[in-house]
């Protein structure tokens, strides 16, 4: 059996010692079935690539899994301490860090072919409408803590930046969908759907169903949720859920901050082989 475990929003930047966090320990300290192959999807907000904690985490998990698919989240780019760095600096550090571990595959608008299945990875971001842009740019930390180089100066990113990245990500996914001859599992940080009270499908806590900030967390990609996609795994909303949409598994498994109770399950997984059989 090929087992794909999936987690997100570990926020190692706020954890002093990963060895003392039992939920994290279960990601590397568990009994493996010798007949199974284990993969791990890290769906963003894992940690700051300039901190020691994420490298120590990688040292723990790298020997355990055959492949680890790592999609950066928005928090990977946060400037919490000086010296402040641009998003390009963070991307370079992410690339260099992952290159130290041959089985950790950094995926941001990338595709990985694994035998009879393909994985697409993308931070994804989201599209912020003009009507919500003023509120979201003030209330969401991305627009205060993520920096870019503009005219040789370090400055805050804008709604226009994240909207552009979102368009690029969706275009990349659409292009891969057109060319794919294999079933696809898509891995993103931002959610592919908004919560739906009528269907009872929640990609975030139902208490946020009418939040003015929803566009910073969700996309409405319902029109592209078709074959050959067989599963879409994501993070970002600090909520854990799993449901079927148009025959596709939509699932998330998020740890979140220490004061939150998000029903995180370090053993959550998808059976890749069974998923392929179900989609014959």
Curated annotation (Swiss-Prot):
It comes from the Viruses. InterPro entries: Calcineurin-like_PHP_ApaH (IPR004843), Metallo-depent_PP-like (IPR029052). Disulfide bonds: none annotated. GO terms for molecular function: hydrolase activity. Pfam families: Metallophos (PF00149). PANTHER family: CALCINEURIN-LIKE PHOSPHOESTERASE DOMAIN-CONTAINING PROTEIN, SER/THR PROTEIN PHOSPHATASE SUPERFAMILY (AFU_ORTHOLOGUE AFUA_1G14840). This is Uncharacterized protein L509.
